[in-house]
Design a protein with these regions (language model features):
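Charged/polar, solvent-exposed surface patches and flexible loops
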Residues: 10-11, 30-33, 49, 53, ...
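Helix N-cap and loop-to-helix transition residues
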Residues: 5, 22-25, 44, 59, ...
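Short acidic, gly/pro-rich beta-turn/loop elements at beta-sheet edges
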Residues: 14, 41, 123
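Long, low-complexity, charge-rich intrinsically disordered regions
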Residues: 74-195
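Helix-turn-helix/homeodomain-like alpha-helical modules used for DNA recognition
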Residues: 17-103
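Short helix-start
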Residues: 1-17
Length: 195
């Protein structure tokens, strides 16, 4: 089935498609981890070198566009009493909980985070998530690949999620932080040509 909603049309219109082929989830996460100063041990040395070289030429808009296929977004409704269960099962991202302060956003009870495709059905059933209720208070980024780790996603991933948001404040906060992270990464790697 294919569902076309106002939100999906606005989201598609929001995407900038100008700059080349999109990254695979593995490379998209690596790029967002790399600009966050995190380890990307799932890449080979040559892949790291090529990615570093590519990241030194990108701006925030290009990076968001290239990383757009890292996960698909599922917006769902959940009872307030079950939100904690969802929070424990995913890697939090965007402006969820205490992450909101990092972006000067107001903290809400909404939950946003990442999980593997193989875990989606289990979490939907356990937390009794509903896609047919509004407003959605759970946004799940479902991916075929998520780097190993626990806790919140790195700040680069959170920034990209916010930059993809249809909310103007969230989008602006995400792009501002991505611009800062990229600028720092590019100045730290300027002129370096080592593997």
């Amino acid at each position: 089935r294919l569902y076309i909603t106002n939100e999906s049309v606005r989201r598609l219109n929001h995407v900038d498609r100008k700059r080349g082929r999109t990254f695979s989830p593995r490379i998209a996460f690596a790029s967002l981890y790399m600009i966050s100063g995190e380890s990307v041990n799932w890449l080979s040395a040559s892949e790291k070198y090529q990615l570093k070289k590519r990241l030194t030429t990108l701006n925030a808009t290009d990076l968001v566009s290239l990383c757009r296929n890292r996960a698909r977004l599922c917006s769902m409704w959940c009872r307030e009493s079950r939100l904690e269960k969802v929070t424990q099962e995913i890697r939090l991202s965007a402006g969820t909980g205490e992450l909101a302060a990092e972006f000067n956003l107001t903290e809400t009870s909404d939950v946003e985070g990442y999980l593997l495709e193989s875990d989606l059905q289990r979490i939907v059933e356990q937390a009794k998530l509903r896609s047919d209720f509004q407003p959605a208070n759970v946004r799940l980024h479902v991916s075929s690949y998520i780097p190993n780790g626990s806790g919140n996603m790195p700040i680069g991933v959170c920034s990209a999620d916010l930059a993809d948001s249809l909310d103007v404040r969230e989008c602006g906060a995400g792009f501002d932080k991505l611009t800062q992270l990229l600028s720092r990464f590019q100045s730290d790697n300027k002129g370096k040509d080592s593997r």
